[in-house]
């Protein structure tokens, strides 16, 4: 917001080549605001801004810019600028950039790093894709349990400038094995002669370096920490993951789930940059599956061709019946998938969900069935449409079918995520279109069987 208000002034400073004033102005701004301003400028002026910023601030601002824009800037910057920014970036943000680049380009950028930064970069990139190791940073404060509070505070003042966070201090033994994490407030509130061993309680949570990022997100939700330590297979502290990284993971997970619920494969690139053919492939796969599934609807209708010929009026209500079942199923599957994602539901809760959705499905079906019954009766009474001599039986058929189809759709939508979870698959795969397709076919069978039962001897 600040950037938009001052955009004309910034533009004037750039045109006047008053870089000193520009530098002093940006020193007073949060890096996120500077990044917002830069993205609103033409490409050549973006490079100018980075050229006048101090190296540390330039790296901080660079980290708030999207991956695509980062790559464009690196291509436009001078060699010295690229070297300075890459070496000043925090290891986790640099890893996020490098892993999104083509292998050859990433290798060239790694060569620009100092030996120490190169060692860190190659180490983090060596962990499996999607693992905690790719998210973590080795910049943290670690102390020993025989230190005093005074020693800890002196150490933090000396080496804390490069730490990702100072909210937590990690206690390790002589081999680097994690013993505990202690909040900084504990050191600030204790006498300076107090030993670390007197403060720690060994009550801590830690991530394994090969844990998935989704598992890490669940741990963060459970313990509500700003950072969590990461240990290797021997329990040695190798890094930390902070909550800002988890926010990115949560956004990616939510995006992936939404895309799957929409009936397509999750995109692994932003919508604006994904190649056309890859977009078509990811969308076509599920569309083909759903189309083949919908073909079963035509097959099912062929089985009731005789009934449709005898009572063509039944075909009029097919869209109404089928869409109601699909909509109720989509609602149920969305609710259950989200509850699973938040940890509110586990596999063992399936029976509780069945009971709840039985009542919900019946109630919703009864509401829609009642509306359908009275709609047909009212149209007949007002002479808007003539449903024939057995109009009340047709109304009863539609009402009863709606109860059955909505109940079935609700149960199907609620149980499908549990089935997929039991099979070790992602529950989000049971997307709303998939549930709707399933209920379309089965709803058709329910509708015509209800019609056969009620209308036998009259219209059928």
Feature locations, PLM:
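Membrane-water interface of transmembrane alpha-helices in multipass transporters/channels
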Residues: 303-318, 384-397, 427-428, 460
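Non-transmembrane, extramembrane segments of multi-pass ion/lipid transporters
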Residues: 245-281, 330-354
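Core alpha-helical transmembrane segments of integral membrane proteins
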Residues: 274-341, 346
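Membrane-interface segments at loop-to-transmembrane junctions
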Residues: 273-282, 346-361, 392, 396, ...
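Alpha-helical transmembrane segments in multi-pass membrane proteins
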Residues: 31, 286-294, 317, 321, ...
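Hydrophobic packing positions in regular secondary-structure scaffolds
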Residues: 1-265
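Juxtamembrane/transmembrane-helix interface segments of polytopic membrane transporters
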Residues: 294, 298, 302, 368, ...
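Re-entrant/interfacial helical elements at transmembrane boundaries that shape
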Residues: 330-341, 417-421, 432-433, 445, ...
């Amino acid at each position: 917001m600040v950037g938009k208000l001052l955009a004309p002034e910034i533009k004037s400073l750039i045109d006047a080549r008053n870089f000193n004033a520009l530098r002093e102005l940006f020193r007073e701004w949060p890096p996120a605001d500077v990044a917002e301003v830069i993205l609103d400028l033409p490409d050549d002026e973006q490079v100018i801004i980075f050229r006048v910023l101090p190296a540390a601030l330039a790296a901080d601002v660079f980290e708030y810019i999207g991956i695509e824009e980062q790559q464009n800037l690196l291509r436009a910057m001078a060699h010295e600028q690229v070297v300075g920014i890459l070496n000043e970036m925090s290891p986790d943000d640099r890893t996020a950039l490098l892993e999104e680049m083509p292998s050859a380009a990433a290798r060239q950028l790694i060569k620009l790093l100092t030996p120490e930064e190169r060692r860190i970069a190659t180490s983090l990139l060596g962990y499996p894709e999607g693992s905690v190791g790719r998210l973590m940073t080795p910049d943290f404060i670690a102390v020993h349990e025989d230190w005093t509070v005074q020693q800890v505070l002196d150490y933090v003042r000396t080496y804390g400038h490069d730490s990702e966070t100072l909210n937590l201090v990690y206690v390790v033994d002589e081999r680097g094995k994690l013993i505990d994490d202690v909040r900084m407030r504990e050191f600030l509130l204790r006498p300076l002669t107090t030993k670390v061993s007197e403060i720690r309680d060994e009550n801590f949570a830690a991530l394994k370096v090969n844990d998935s990022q989704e598992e890490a997100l669940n741990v963060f939700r459970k313990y509500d920490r700003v950072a969590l330590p990461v240990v290797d297979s021997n329990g040695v502290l190798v890094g930390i993951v902070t909550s800002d990284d988890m926010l990115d993971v949560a956004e990616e997970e939510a995006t992936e789930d939404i895309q799957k619920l929409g009936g397509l494969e999750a995109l692994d690139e932003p919508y604006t940059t994904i190649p056309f053919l890859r977009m078509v492939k990811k969308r076509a796969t599920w569309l083909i599956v759903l189309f083949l599934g919908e073909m079963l609807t035509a097959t099912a209708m062929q089985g009731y061709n005789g009934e449709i010929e005898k009572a063509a009026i039944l075909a009029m209500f097919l869209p109404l019946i089928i869409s109601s079942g699909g909509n109720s199923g989509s609602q149920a599957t969305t609710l259950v998938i989200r509850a699973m994602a938040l940890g509110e539901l586990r596999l063992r809760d399936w029976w509780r969900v069945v009971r709840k959705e039985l009542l919900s499905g019946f109630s919703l079906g009864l509401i829609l069935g009642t509306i359908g019954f009275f709609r047909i009766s009212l149209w007949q009474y007002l002479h808007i449409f003539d449903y024939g001599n057995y109009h009340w039986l047709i109304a009863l058929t539609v009402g009863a079918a709606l109860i059955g189809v909505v109940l079935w759709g609700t149960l199907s939508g609620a149980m499908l995520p549990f089935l997929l979870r039991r099979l070790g698959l992602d529950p989000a795969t049971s997307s709303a279109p998939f549930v709707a397709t399933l209920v379309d076919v089965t709803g058709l069978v329910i509708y015509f069987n209800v019609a056969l039962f009620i209308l036998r001897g009259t219209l059928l």
